[in-house]
Regions:
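Conserved C-terminal structural/oligomerization subdomain of aldehyde/semialdehyde dehydrogenase
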Residues: 13-16, 48, 59-61, 68-193
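Active-site region of PLP-dependent enzymes
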Residues: 16-22
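Conserved small-domain helix->loop->beta segment predominantly found in fold-type I
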Residues: 22-23, 52-63, 76
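Short beta-strand to alpha-helix junction loop
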Residues: 29-40
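Helical element adjacent to the flavin cofactor pocket in flavoenzyme catalytic cores
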Residues: 41-51
Length: 193
């Protein structure tokens, strides 16, 4: 394994999973039992199809109640696996190598349902801006994770249907109407009423 993969594994294993405002929690529960079962199924199916589980993949030790999934790291993930093709909406990282930036962008845009958020981490901001412009996601975050009620939030395709947060979210509820008025009211467009 390369140094990047080792760092991701270390970060996943060091995550503090739970739900307690008095402790420094880094990973909370997934939304409900159905989501947990779906995520567990994605991991189990990937492993049965040849992916390698390097961290997580099940409930964290000591958290038998609730909908917690330990931060999960998979390698040897192929493009035919559901964990590759679908947005997980859970603490699962699939490490998939690439050879060219064209291949990287093709793979990143290869989600069946559309795209809610993509994250880019790099020291090369010109590269980040290039990739951001080429990604088909409703939200691109560069070198960080930022969620703010004043920033628009929403996806593309079937992901994050509609938009919320910020004044732009109101556009989903508005209907445009055009009214044109002639400035010359003496002839009324030749109708002479």
């Amino acid at each position: 394994r390369d140094a990047f993969t080792e760092k991701v594994i270390d970060r996943a294993r060091a995550a503090k999973v739970g739900f307690d405002k008095t402790v420094d929690i880094t990973t909370g529960p997934v939304i409900d039992a159905r989501a947990w079962t779906r995520l567990k199924g994605l991991v189990d199916d990937a492993v049965s199809e040849g992916a390698t589980l390097l961290a997580g993949g099940d409930r964290p030790a000591g958290l038998n109640a609730g909908h917690y999934l330990a931060p999960t790291v998979l390698t040897d993930v192929t493009e035919t696996m559901a964990v590759y093709r679908e947005e997980t909406f859970g603490p699962i990282v699939s490490i998939v190598p690439f050879d060219t930036k064209t291949e990287l962008l093709r793979m990143a845009n290869d989600c069946e349902e559309g795209g809610l958020t993509a994250y880019i981490f790099t020291r090369n901001l010109a590269r980040a801006e290039h990739y951001a412009a080429s990604l088909r996601y409703g939200e691109i975050q560069i070198n960080g994770v930022k969620y703010d009620i004043n920033l628009p939030h929403g996806g593309i395709g079937q992901s994050g249907i509609g938009h919320d947060c910020s004044a732009l979210a109101l556009h989903d509820y508005l209907v445009q109407k055009r009214i044109t008025r002639a400035l010359d009211t003496t002839t009324f467009g030749g109708l002479n009423p």
